[in-house]
A protein has these predicted regions:
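Extended interfacial segments that mediate partner engagement and assembly in macromolecular machines
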Residues: 2-106, 115
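Nucleotide donor/acceptor-binding cores
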Residues: 46, 119, 209
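A short interface-forming secondary-structure element
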Residues: 78, 121-131
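Short acidic/polar mixed-charge low-complexity motifs
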Residues: 57, 69-71, 117, 171-175, ...
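Secondary-structure transition/turn motif
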Residues: 64-68, 123-127, 180-181
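Short hydrophobic/aromatic beta-strand micro-patches
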Residues: 51-53, 112, 122-126
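Rossmann-like S-adenosyl-L-methionine
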Residues: 128-306
């Protein structure tokens, strides 16, 4: 079974249908008409992951149709992914198929790329990885000029680093982000820059007021917006994202951001003085004069009180 080709020419119609669907959900709220920013139709996604399906002596990338979850869909090209990922896929697969130490019990391959050309590949196995695998993987990383991580149950081998570095251009500035394997990043890099630019335009400058951001991730919006506020108070629950955020603040030389590792429910409780937290012992919540709240919530949404 193979995947159907992407209909690039139909993208504008698909986008319009999606916009109308979303608008209909919020029709009772009397919101202004949405502003629509089209994406590239191909090569827009900076992350991709595939099962590696073994068929006799050959392995290939595979995905699964929810309607037929036991039947692998062979993926030879994936134009949805960034061109760097799409170009790398056959080169990497050829290397994997040519060396048993790489292909043996390999069941998943994950790609993380950036607009600025960095690439991280995670190879995930159903076996313990040894020194032989590490030596071959180091050669592979050098030949393909990529970062490689090997994973198996309770094992993670980082050959060099477990992150990529993005240099994101927004409104004439360049923002630097470490993006860690396993951490959330915006998958559409070009549209991410557009979203940040749009957010900056909406808030204007409020240098005498403060920003509250819920679920800030690695500082994707936090860093560009911090220049337009006196202070920023941000929350995040992922350890990986909090670590990346602190490192990204340093890389971008911003010092007016306080990140709290807590949920929106907990922060709301603290702001309402319903509960105290040791994590807030060093933070004077009363010193914040919040003018704007930014939230990109998790899929579960926000709690009612927040």
């Amino acid at each position: 079974m193979s995947i159907n080709p992407i209909d690039i020419d139909n993208y504008p119609a698909i986008l319009q249908d999606k916009a109308q669907e979303v608008a209909s959900i919020f029709k009772d709220l009397a919101l202004p008409a949405p502003t629509i920013f089209p994406s590239q139709a191909v090569h827009y996604r900076l992350r991709a992951e595939f099962r590696l399906w073994h068929d006799n002596a050959e392995a290939y990338y595979a995905m699964f149709d929810p309607a037929e979850p036991k039947t692998p869909v062979r993926i030879d090209k994936f134009p949805t992914a960034s061109k760097a990922i799409d170009d790398l896929m056959p080169l990497l697969l050829s290397k994997i198929n040519s060396q048993t130490v790489l292909s043996k019990r390999l069941f998943q391959v994950e790609f993380l790329s950036t607009l600025s050309g960095d690439m991280l590949v995670s190879l995930i196995y159903h076996r313990l990885l040894d020194e032989e695998w590490e030596a071959v993987a180091r050669t592979l990383a050098s030949e393909l000029n990529i970062q490689i991580i090997g994973r198996s149950k309770k094992q993670k081998l980082v050959l060099d680093r477990d992150y990529v570095v993005e240099n994101l251009p927004v409104d004439g500035e360049t923002f630097i982000y470490k993006q860690y394997e396993g951490g959330f990043t915006q998958p559409n890099g070009a549209l991410n820059a557009t979203m940040i630019s749009w957010a900056k335009e909406q808030v204007k400058e409020k240098l005498d007021r403060d920003l509250l951001e819920l679920y800030c991730g690695n500082g994707n919006f936090t860093i560009p917006l911090s220049k337009q506020f006196r202070k920023v108070l941000a929350t995040e629950i992922s350890k990986t994202s909090v670590k990346a955020a602190h490192e990204n603040f340093a890389l971008n030389k911003v010092s007016n951001i306080e990140v709290l590792r807590m949920s929106s429910e907990e922060l709301t409780s603290a702001l309402n003085k319903e509960r105290s937290f040791r994590r807030l012992e060093h933070v004077d919540l009363d010193s914040y004069n919040i003018a704007t709240v930014l939230v990109d919530p998790p899929r579960a949404g926000l709690d009612h009180n927040t």
